[in-house]
Amino acid sequence: EMGVKDIGYGCTVSNKNSEDMLWLYKLSRELGMEFATAAFHNSYYFHKDDNEITNKDEVIGNFHKLIEELLKDNSPKSWYRAFFNLGLINYIRGNPRMLPCEAGTANFFIEPYGDVFPCNGLEDRYWKESMGNIRDVSSFDELWFSEQAEKVRGLVRTCPKNCWMVGTAAPVMKKYIKHPTSWVVKNKIKSMLGKPICIDDVPHFDVGQDPLQGNLRESAVPVHKMTFQPREPEVVLSEAEL
């Protein structure tokens, strides 16, 4: 009635509700709505540091079923969502991301007091450093191209966390589109032929990322000497495609 064509809802999966996403997905298809998924994470801003999927087999099994359903759909968006959900399985298993995190370059987060962070998933036990505060600069470009912002981007490149959230996954899925596409094409064909989708051999794509990123070490992030290069902004304020 309001003329909104792209509308939907999502489900953040924890230990107790993974089975719900299967019927919620089916309901979304019946209603002609979009359906998105996430898995719970820890963050200073989420006020949580003990979120952990403990019944991994059950949760991964339900994500597997969802992936197979998504690949049966006629929409390419659903096929790429299947890839995104494979990334959630990979995250739950505690592995480094399939594609690198480029938070602080492809996206950013402004907290209520004006500090700009690369994302909202930072934790003190790993690292948490601001790129600057919007109240202390005359323009956003001054902050975005500052040495402090570049320093934080360096910390992102060696960040121990293996988060897989839409805000940081979607931009790199688009940037390195050939890698998700290769998985999508292969597994869409398997789905059309009635073959099972394998989730045990999760691809990890080397696009030049630092091997330290996402290794879940709970220690100080190593500081590397960096050369500051001027760059064009690649800012994504919101992401609704997944």
Model-found features: residue ranges?
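Residues that form generic nucleotide/phosphate-binding pockets
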Residues: 62-69, 142-143, 155, 162, ...
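Alpha-helix boundary/capping detector
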Residues: 54, 185, 189-190
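Short cysteine/histidine-rich metal-coordination sites, predominantly Zn2+-binding motifs
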Residues: 176-187
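Radical SAM enzyme [4Fe-4S]-AdoMet core and its adjacent flexible, acidic
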Residues: 1-117, 121-132, 172, 176, ...
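Short Fe-S-cluster ligation motifs
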Residues: 151-160, 188-218
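Hydrophobic alpha-helical context, especially transmembrane and signal-peptide helices
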Residues: 19, 137-138, 194-199
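Membrane-interface junctions of multi-pass transporters
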Residues: 122-170
